[in-house]
UniProtKB/Swiss-Prot annotation:
Residues 323-335 have a biased composition (Low complexity). This is Cyclin-D4-2. It comes from Oryza sativa subsp. japonica. Residues 51-62 have a biased composition (Gly residues). Belongs to the cyclin family. Cyclin D subfamily. One of its GO terms (biological process) is cell division. Pfam families: Cyclin_C (PF02984), Cyclin_N (PF00134). One of its GO terms (molecular function) is cyclin-dependent protein serine/threonine kinase regulator activity. Keywords: Cell cycle, Cell division, Cyclin.
Length: 383
């Protein structure tokens, strides 16, 4: 007999381990039980915040060796990463839809979410990889799911869930879910609500959370442009800065992580030593040289700034989808009710993974569309 929806939900939700029980998420610890170093196909994940002087983020302790901040990747590992990186990218048309303002993907929603992620990343001194992962999860989710208009709490809840998952993937010490909601947020979500949203994100992304990012390659490409030697710390800092600035904008969403990393490495090395096109063509064997040069030109032309995340203004009320006068008789009264209102449906497949049920054909629309929330009371975090 097939398991019930509620029992599947309980089983899947039990995997969402937050700091409250001091466990790792998704059983990613190695055979010795160490959580700090995770491996995927023999390739080491990046840990450490360069801008903080190599700290492990969030009280994780300093990482003294540059080798630990940007582990050296082998040729075989890089080739493996390139093969699977596309599975960790948003839909191919996502960037165009964002910039086109067609309405199905709201650029304002993304900007607000990234702005909040950046605030918490800075407050807790998280690693740069954590911040990038949170944005990666956000973009992949938004490229497939359409959040309803006028549900500001949904944007904030999605931001909290994405950053919470990213912190569990990369940080050695993870703040409790309530503590992630710093300052005076408009809405304060309970742990159970955050876990439910985490589950929605996880299932929608097919549980592919150890994403390939530009940080996975940056040491490799910097070494290539530095005669095989470890890159100076200044190069690493500058690379980290550029990668995060690129993540905040929308002009690079179509580029693969390897292409972004190669372009950033070429830009940083060029600023320091005057690397030219011939050096790039000779050094980079795993990426399309034309795409790398195109990405590098975009970096140099646009001079991306962190300010880009705050430049989008809300749409006029007349352009918003739907109506605010939804029937109150069928309106869930809380985020938990909305998340429970037909959103999560699980089924067994060949991979035994929990998946979100498709709502109609073609692109999946958010099941929240049929569950408007009328009460958006301002709640403050009291400490």
């Amino acid at each position: 007999m097939a398991p019930s929806s509620s029992s599947c939900h309980d089983a899947a939700a039990s995997m969402l381990l937050c700091a409250e029980d001091n466990s790792s998420i998704l059983w990613l610890e190695d055979e010795e039980g160490e959580v700090g170093e995770r491996r995927s196909g023999g390739c080491r994940s990046m840990v450490g915040d360069l801008a903080a002087g190599g700290g492990g983020g969030s009280g994780g302790g300093g990482v003294e060796e540059e080798e630990d901040m940007f582990p050296r990747q082998s040729e075989e590992c890089v080739a493996s990463l390139v093969e699977r990186e596309q599975a960790h990218m948003p839909r191919a048309d996502y960037g165009e839809r964002l910039r086109g303002g067609g309405g199905d993907v709201d650029l304002r929603v993304r900007s607000e979410a990234i702005g909040w992620i950046w605030e918490v990343y800075t407050y807790y001194n998280f690693s740069s990889v954590t911040a990038y992962l949170a944005v990666n999860y956000l973009d992949r989710f938004l490229s497939q799911y359409e959040l309803p208009e006028g549900r500001d709490w949904m944007t904030q809840l999605l931001s909290v869930a994405c950053l919470s998952i990213a912190a569990k993937m990369e940080e050695t010490v993870v703040p409790q879910c309530l503590d992630l909601q710093i300052g005076e947020p408009r809405f304060l979500f309970e742990v159970e609500t955050i876990h439910r949203m985490e589950l929605l994100v996880l299932t929608n992304l097919n549980w592919r959370m150890q994403a390939v990012t530009p940080f996975s390659y940056i040491d490799y490409f910097l070494r290539k442009l530095n005669s095989g030697n470890a890159a100076p710390r200044s190069w690493l800092l500058r690379s980290s800065e550029l990668i995060l600035r690129i993540a905040a904008g929308t002009g690079f969403l179509e580029f693969r992580p390897s292409e972004i990393a190669a372009a950033v490495a070429a830009t940083v090395a060029g600023e320091a030593t005057g690397v030219v096109e011939e050096d790039i063509a000779e050094a980079f064997t795993h990426v399309d040289k034309g795409r790398v040069l195109q990405c590098q030109e975009a970096i140099q032309d646009h001079h991306y700034s962190m300010a880009t995340i705050n430049t989008v203004q809300p749409k006029p009320a007349s352009t918003r989808r739907g109506s605010a006068s939804a029937s109150s008789s069928s309106v869930p009264e809380s985020p938990v009710a909305v998340l429970d209102a037909g959103c999560l449906s699980y089924k067994s497949d060949d991979t035994d993974a929990a998946t979100i049920a498709s709502h109609g054909g073609g692109r999946r629309k958010s099941c929240f569309d049929s569950s408007p929330v009328t009460s958006k009371k301002r709640r403050k975090l009291s400490r």
